[in-house]
């Protein structure tokens, strides 16, 4: 029985699911805002900011898991190198902190399809997420193993798990051809699964996503 964590670090939201591999999963969704502590002001009434998650990023204190408009003089990341930014690392640490665990057997995370198809980018993220992480001054979390998937696959796996004990006609087999579309804030991603395999030539990423529509 291992402890498993799923993290989807998006441009708008941080979504995590965690629990033992043979038990129920807890799910949490937080906004994907993250910036150094000094970019956040205090409340007008003097009360504590109780929705702040304080995490360590390379020795600097960050606030993570808040709305992107809460940080002053700090722009949100909207580019392909998002996964290499300090804000992304802060959200990763926030996700680990929210699990309340000190050791995780398997962490599953995703990349946009175009980045997932780059083996070097997949391996770089896997290596960075594996091992010990000093998420706060007092807490270190050890991640034993990491699996990187194409982001839309998470929705498909959730559906497979949901219908596993349901009617036979609802279950997915290798005979099915499945298109999964994941409309995000920065990118629109899609995957085609056929014969139980991700069809790389029919899967991809478009940057004409929600952020473009809102401009």
Residue ranges and their predicted role:
Residues 1-178, 197-210, 215:
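Nucleotide/phosphate-binding catalytic cleft detector across ATP-hydrolyzing
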Residues 177-194:
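Hydrophobic, aromatic-enriched interface-forming segments
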